Structure formats: C-alpha cells, structure tokens
Amino acid sequence: MLIFAEKYDRNKEEKRKMKRIISILLYMAVLLPLAAQPPKHEVRAAWITAVYGLDWPQTRTTSPEGIRKQQAELIEILDRLKAANFNTVLFQTRTRGDVLYKSAIEPYNSILTGKVGGDPGYDPLAFAIAECHKRGMECHAWMVTIPLGNRKHVAALGKESVTKKKRAICVPYKREYFLNPGHPQTKEYLMSLVREVVERYDVDGIHFDYLRYPENAPRFPDSYDYRKYSKGRSLAQWRRDNLTEIVRYIYKGVKAMKPWVKVSTCPVGKYKDTSRYPSRGWNAFHTVYQDVQGWLGEGIQDQIYPMLYFRGNHFYPFALDWQEQSNGRQIIPGLGIYFLDPSEGNWTLDEIERQMHFIRAHGLAGEAHYRVKYLMDNTQGLYDALEEDFYTAPALQPAMPWIDNVAPTPPSGLTVETPENGYWKPVSYTHLTLP
C-alpha cells in the first residue's frame, strides 16, 4: 500500500512538472513572439538633408542626364527606406531663405544646379511627394524657419533674398541673418511660404526646424520691437510668446486649408529641467525660448520631434517627460544616429537599440533618424538591425483623433476587367520629369 502511495505521489508531481513545462512552452510559443512583434501603428521617419547636399543631391541638374541622375539618387534612398518598412520622409524643402520647390517667394537653392536660383528643370518637392506616395510613405515638407544664413550666403542670393525684399522683418546677429520673431509680419511671411506648399502640393505634413531664437542670445537685436510690443512682459516671456504666436497662426492656417495635413516641429531635445534629471543649462524653454509643452497643451501641434541626440540620463528622462506632457499628441524622438559614425561620436549600435526599445515600452509614437546618410551607409549595422529586428513588418500611421474619429470610407464601385489579350506585368516606377 505504501509503495502504491509513493508511486501515486510521484505521478502527481510528474504531472505538475509536465503542466509547468507545457505552460512555459506555450508562453514561449505564443506570448514571446507577440511581444517581439513591431507595433501596428508607429511613425518610422528619416530626415533627408539637402543643405550642402549632406544627404541629397550629389549631382547637379546641368543637363537632362543630370536631372535623371539627381532623381535616381533620391529614388535609391526612398527604395531603401521602403525596403526597411519606413513610412515617413522628412524632406528638406526650405533651407536658409531658399527652397527646393518652384516658389514665387524665394529662390531655388543652389545645391540643385550649382547656381543660385537656378531652375533644376523639374520640381524636387513634387517629385519627392509622388515617389514617396508610390511607395506608401508620407512626405513632410521640412522647413528651416528663422535662420537666413551667413553674410556670404545672403549676398549670394542678392535681390532675391528676403533680407532685400522684406528688410523690416530681418535682423543681423553674429555675422548671420535671422527673421525677427518679434515683428508681427514675420508670421505672415512664413505663412505665405507654408501656404504655397500646402495649397499646391499633396504634402502630408509641414515640419518646422529652427523655429527658435539663436541660442544664448541676450543681445539679439529686438529691443525696438520689445519696447513697442511687449506690453509689460519680461523679455524672455515676450520672446516665448512670439514663437507661440507664429506656431498658433500657422497651425490654424494649415488646418483651415487642409485639416489632414500634419503640423510638427523638431525642438531642442530637452524642454527644461525635469524632476528626474537636470538639463544642464541647455533646453528649449530657457535657452531658445521654445515653450513647446505650451504648444502641446494648447493643441497647436500634431507631432513633436524633439531632437534627443543624447544618450543615457540625457535621453531617457527627457523622452519620458515629453510623453507625459504630450496632451495626447504624438511624440517622435529624433535619434542622433550620426553619432554611430566614428568621426562623430563612435556610439555603439546598442545605444540606439536601447533607445528604440524604450520608445516602444513607454508608448511614444515612434522615432525619426537623423540623418538618412547613416541609414544608407548601414553605419554600425543600423540599417540591418532595423530591417531584421525592429521594422520587420510595415506599420500604419498613428491616428489623430483630435482631428476626427471618422474612419476612411470603404472603396466602392470597383470593377475588375480582364481584356481578351491581357497579361500580367510587374509594376515599375517611371521616372518622369515633373513640371
């Protein structure tokens, strides 16, 4: 009887062990793969920098062959982004008082042709939008806002420079020129550029860069405007209010034209000191007068791309702070992938990987990579890691419920026709020169 009881106990114990093993195997087989799956909705963005041809273009359009080569360079970048399941392109559209689209206000950037104001023979922004959309990617017009360039650059633009056309809203400071955020007409001038882009192009977003005062600018020459318009506010508060008014004015203007066009800014990466970690004197609020969390609270931004080109305690507490103060808007940290280059910082790949894991774990909307060259060069194996580990499946854009909650209308009235002599042909991209 005792032997039977011992066998019975052993059998019960073995069954319990087997159940535990089966449970563990089920967890590994079902839950772990689910945890490893990329999010269904996520912004996966890359900045394509045109200034100085840092990312694009390398070829000048001095001939029809030059046009084809310049377009082919961009297509190669977009093809590789699409292959790695990116879904957002931040395409530099305005640099410093010059542009990469056919504008009635500012001249073409010389990087396209080698000549200031030179017509490249096609419209780069229209081409970029069309090629992004062919690949199912959004194209946002990235516009440098306040800086106008150094004296040499402004002189090269000549009479086409805004410093000549709109002297009242431009100021020199430390051998460079800037739009003056304190002048009431500055917001109207910037809105005129945005209006050109939003009205004429099927752009998915307007993305502002350098929407800020020069760093550490106690002597920025705006004392006349401060005396005239400050109405008793401190200089710092007046400057912050000036930038906020520009943001508010343009946001409302864009939404009045096309509510679905996203409006975003890439501010300085640290808003201000947090309870978790200090900003060490370099932040958006105090250093360059960007009250970005105020913009979020007021609902006059759809997305914020904080330039969190840091690591360790200079990244994680501030990324979390942005998310906690987002007011439900999308926070997409900019990752400093250029630091993977040995000549820039020689970060190891795991620095970027840890940041991406953190972004997902804390529910941020995605990330943006600065800049696309380091993706194309597969610096430290980053492109491979994205393609094989992080972006293994396509992702949809996160919803913007503050715009509307209406789902797209299902397609209707579709028909399928089979011609008598028809045949299947794979899709190929036709690289047309756009007007």
Model-derived features: where do they sit?
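Glycine-rich, aromatic-flanked loop segments that form ligand/cofactor-binding clefts
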Residues: 40-46, 86-94, 124-169, 207, ...
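Active-site-adjacent "subsite" loops/lids of carbohydrate-active enzymes
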Residues: 53-69, 146-196
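Catalytic domains of carbohydrate-active enzymes, especially glycoside hydrolases
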Residues: 72-97
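Aromatic- and acidic-residue-enriched segments that line the glycan-binding/catalytic groove
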Residues: 101-113, 147-173, 211-231, 276-282
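Active-site neighborhood of glycoside hydrolase catalytic domains
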Residues: 200, 205, 212-267, 271-277, ...
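Substrate-binding cleft of secreted/luminal carbohydrate-active enzymes
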Residues: 302-313, 332-399
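Pro/Thr/Ser/Gly-rich low-complexity, intrinsically disordered linker/stalk tracts
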Residues: 392-429
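Conserved small/polar residues in nucleotide/adenosyl-binding loops
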Residues: 430-435
